[in-house]
């Protein structure tokens, strides 16, 4: 499927699900398509995922402290809308082929601006945005990048008296103009998100540099480049800006190799230190042993007569808190994974889609059970789920993880 066709599919998906934020998952979406660059802010419609936490220490190794830090990080509305869109699509079975395309991004990472304004009462002619992108893996293909800046024009700014305003995004190193657009002054005093395409410069920077910081600079001009406007009048200043209204760099990537959920856990292990993880593992191990002792066997007796039920899909409810993963997983906190269980005995049913090898093995087992075990009841089809989580650098990440839900079972 060509990039344009995939983008059209995605646009229709957003429209169908009632999500109206721009979401370029492909290079064509962020650098080739000239769509509206001003996205209305969602305001109070944002779901409250985080809670204010006064202080917590990540290096303490304490699980509750790590959970408190996770709770203090609130995802931007944009990341929540991405998660909700694709989670809903997965439930409806709409985006399976969409994400299987080699062009599609399966990971979207948001980096929050760490820059500071120089002076409170001085004119703001240039605004620098700094992002720590050190957690971005080298084993990913960068498919798109955009800078999203929340702005609300000051009430003292008279748009009708100034004429069109052009805002320009520049490289901090070369000061070359990367992107520019005319500020939409209609309903200018309503809050909105301005979106800039930074895919080319970010890809070049990642290719030639291994630094941890990515820097961009913003300025605004009137009818010629010499007449710059104080950015504070246009609402680009940082003073009094809450965390959820800070600028974010959104990077769209696709992993060059399949990653498991344990990849993020390993990255956090490196950050937390081995001692704390050793204690956590021992604690979880004791908990698991006590659960095995206290809880009855779900599958009945392990010894004696075997179950006669045939291979089929059975419930398996996964709770990330019980796994100890709720210190980094934002959503979902639980989901239905299902599992496969039952006998693969002769004759094998066609709906189990047995392989030729499984058919032969099952036939041999029926003739001589003591010498040949039966074929195994395993997942024959799996589907992905969307996960919104916090990475080792405390960045909010959306990722679609493959092979998370059993759709059907078979004998292998």
Swiss-Prot record:
GO terms for cellular component: extracellular space. One of its GO terms (biological process) is BMP signaling pathway. It is found in: Secreted. The gene is gdf6b. Pfam families: TGF_beta, TGFb_propeptide. Residues 281-311 have a biased composition (Basic residues). It comes from the Eukaryota. Homodimer; disulfide-linked. Expression is correlated temporally and spatially with somitogenesis. At late gastrula stage, expressed in the posterior presumptive neural plate. During somitogenesis, expression becomes restricted along the dorsoventral axis of the trunk neural tube in an anterior-to-posterior progression so that upon completion of somitogenesis, expression is seen exclusively in the ventral spinal cord with the exclusion of the floor plate and adjacent neural cells. Induction: By shh. Residues 22-287 form a propeptide. Its main location: secreted. It comes from Danio rerio (Zebrafish). InterPro entries: Cystine-knot_cytokine, TGF-b_C, TGF-b_propeptide, TGF-beta-rel, TGFb_CS. Residues 280-311 are annotated as: Disordered. CDD domains: TGF_beta_GDF5_6_7. Residues 1-21 form the signal peptide. This is Growth/differentiation factor 6-B. Keywords: Cleavage on pair of basic residues, Disulfide bond, Glycoprotein, Growth factor, Secreted, Signal. Belongs to the TGF-beta family. Disulfide bonds join 311-377, 340-409, 344-411. Glycans are attached at residue 95. GO terms for molecular function: cytokine activity; growth factor activity.
């Amino acid at each position: 499927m060509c990039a344009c066709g995939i983008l059209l599919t995605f646009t229709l998906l957003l429209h169908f699900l009632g999500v109206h934020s721009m979401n370029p998952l492909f290079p064509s979406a962020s650098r080739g398509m000239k769509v509206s660059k001003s996205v209305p802010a969602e305001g109070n419609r944002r779901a409250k995922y985080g809670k204010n936490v006064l202080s917590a220490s990540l290096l303490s190794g304490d699980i509750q402290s790590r959970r408190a830090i996770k709770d203090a990080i609130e995802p931007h509305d944009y990341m929540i809308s991405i998660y909700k869109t694709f989670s809903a699509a997965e439930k409806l079975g709409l985006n399976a082929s969409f994400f299987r395309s080699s062009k599609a991004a399966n990971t979207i990472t948001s980096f929050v601006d760490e820059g500071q304004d120089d002076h409170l009462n001085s004119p703001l002619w240039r605004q620098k945005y700094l992002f720590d992108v050190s957690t971005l893996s080298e084993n990913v293909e960068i498919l798109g990048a955009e800078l999203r800046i929340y702005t609300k024009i000051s009430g003292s700014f008279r748009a009708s008296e100034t004429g069109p305003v052009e805002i320009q995004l520049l490289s901090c190193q070369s000061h070359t103009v990367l992107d520019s657009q005319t500020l939409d002054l209609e309903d200018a005093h309503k809050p909105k998100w301005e979106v800039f395409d930074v895919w080319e410069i970010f890809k070049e920077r990642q290719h030639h540099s291994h630094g941890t910081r990515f820097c961009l600079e913003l300025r605004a001009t009137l009818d010629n480049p010499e007449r710059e406007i104080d950015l504070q009048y246009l609402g680009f200043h940082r003073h009094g800006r809450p965390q959820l209204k800070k600028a974010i760099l959104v990077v769209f990537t696709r992993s060059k190799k399949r990653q498991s959920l344990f990849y993020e856990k390993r990255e956090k292990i490196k950050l937390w230190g081995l001692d704390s993880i050793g204690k956590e593992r021992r604690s979880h191990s004791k908990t698991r042993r006590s659960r095995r002792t206290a809880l009855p066997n779900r599958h009945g007796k392990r010894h004696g007569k075997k179950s006669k039920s045939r291979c089929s899909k059975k419930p398996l409810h996964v709770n990330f808190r019980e796994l100890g993963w709720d210190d980094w997983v934002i959503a979902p906190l639980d989901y239905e994974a299902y599992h496969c269980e039952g006998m693969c005995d002769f004759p094998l049913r066609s709906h189990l889609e047995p392989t030729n090898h499984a058919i032969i093995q099952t036939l041999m087992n029926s003739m001589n059970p003591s010498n040949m075990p039966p074929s195994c009841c395993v997942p024959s089809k799996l589907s992905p789920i969307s996960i919104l989580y916090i990475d080792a650098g405390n960045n909010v990440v959306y990722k679609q993880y493959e092979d998370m839900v059993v759709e059907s079972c078979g004998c292998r």
